Amino acid sequence: MSDEEARQSGGSSQAGVVTVSDVQELMRRKEEIEAQIKANYDVLESQKGIGMNEPLVDCEGYPRSDVDLYQVRTARHNIICLQNDHKAVMKQVEEALHQLHARDKEKQARDMAEAHKEAMSRKLGQSESQGPPRAFAKVNSISPGSPASIAGLQVDDEIVEFGSVNTQNFQSLHNIGSVVQHSEGKPLNVTVIRRGEKHQLRLVPTRWAGKGLLGCNIIPLQR
């Protein structure tokens, strides 16, 4: 392989997707470099513990005769080069871990979105299979300008929910009357079926110029 091919190969590898095995290989390389650095420090230690900065000449300016100058210079040079390599590898490890963590977060977000979508699909499927909720009452008249008219109620709207009253707990119109009396000035959620479509309304029982707090007439539907 030529130098150019080697550079291209290396570039394409770096541009690829980072894997756990890539990080493991970088960690192995890091440990290998650290072992080499220690080995070279051991060489310096064996030479009178000379270290990285002690002079290699005596007080008269002559090369020291009590140490192997070649070994010391070589070990010092190796340590400097290896420390640079170690710094570069640590940067690669940091970048690789960052990519892995970012990918994990993206995967978690995708999984959560997919789970939410699936749950919503199941819920929608259940709703469709159950069909529209059954109405328990019907609006048969509305006075203009009344709270019911302002809320958007229309004649022939079939009520499936009126505040806390619904198909499951409705017994008589007294249930609706009780909710209205206890909700004067407070918004009530009212759900109706109008021409086959469900509509959500907010009705506020209020004293007005006409009779009652709603200004509409509601009749029960036969079950």
Curated annotation (Swiss-Prot):
Pfam families attached to this UniProt entry: Nas2_N, PDZ_6
GO CC terms in record: cytoplasm; cytosol; nucleus; proteasome regulatory particle
Domain PDZ: 108-195
Modified residues annotated as Phosphoserine in this record: 129
Biased composition (Basic and acidic residues): 103-121
Keywords: Chaperone, Phosphoprotein
Record flagged with keyword Transcription regulation: no
Tissue specificity remark: Expressed in all tissues tested, highly expressed in liver and kidney.
Any one GO molecular-function label of the UniProt entry: bHLH transcription factor binding
UniProt record, GO biological process: negative regulation of insulin secretion; positive regulation of DNA-templated transcription; positive regulation of insulin secretion; proteasome regulatory particle assembly; ubiquitin-dependent protein catabolic process
Residue numbers spanned by region Disordered: 103-141
Recorded family membership: Belongs to the proteasome subunit p27 family.
Oligomeric and partner information: Interacts with PSMC3. Part of a transient complex (modulator) containing PSMD9, PSMC6 and PSMC3 formed during the assembly of the 26S proteasome.
Role, per record: Acts as a chaperone during the assembly of the 26S proteasome, specifically of the base subcomplex of the PA700/19S regulatory complex (RC). During the base subcomplex assembly is part of an intermediate PSMD9:PSMC6:PSMC3 module, also known as modulator trimer complex; PSMD9 is released during the further base assembly process.
Protein name: 26S proteasome non-ATPase regulatory subunit 9
Encoding gene (name): PSMD9
